[in-house]
Amino acid sequence: MTCINNYQKERTQMSNLTKEEIIAAKTDLGALRKVIAEGELIIKVRTPICFPCNMATRWTNERGLEDGVDYLEIDVTEIPGSDEYLKNVVAAKTAPVPAGEKEQVEHHEFVDAVIKGEKTTDVSGVKIQTPWIFNLAKLSFETKDNEDTQLYGYQPSNYESAMFKEHLANKQEANKVLAAA
């Protein structure tokens, strides 16, 4: 069994959310959109009858991570339309910047545009039935085919990268470090 003391690291916390905002985001799609657009969250997505979701819950519990403190857990069955919205958020964060637009678009600008319906995004590669722990602040536009979501919490082996600040912020930084060695 892994020693829990190994995970007493600096956590990425959701310090700006009130209790009311957390409750609203779990039950209302509009409130969830607002919270995602305004913050740099870690979101834990849960789907029904999902063994990997239970594994993710066990992983967070073993490390003392708390829903509403360290991440926001969303049950897609409790918010009408949230599954489609979350697909679009992840796809928007991992899609290449469309031709003719500024290359260094801020992630919140891109997500805001998706929320307002100003951009269309192909979400065919996003697996909504797969549970996620993903860190919106760490996702970038540098990779394609959802590599970022794989890297930052899409799989149980990567949860730690999503939840703790001390890990490298993106794969490109890791590659720079390796190239310089």
Sequence positions of predicted segments:
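Short, Lys/Arg-enriched N-terminal segments with co-localized hydrophobic residues
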Residues: 1-13
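N-terminal leader/targeting and pre-domain segments
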Residues: 14-38, 162-181
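Local sequence-structure signature of Cys/Sec-based thiol-disulfide redox active-site neighborhoods
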Residues: 27-67
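Thiol-based oxidoreductase modules, predominantly thioredoxin-like and allied folds used
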Residues: 44-45, 68-107
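Extended low-polarity, hydrophobic cluster-rich segments
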Residues: 52, 72-74, 160-164
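Structural micro-motif
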Residues: 90-139
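Non-catalytic, surface beta->alpha helical segment in thiol-disulfide oxidoreductase systems
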Residues: 124-178
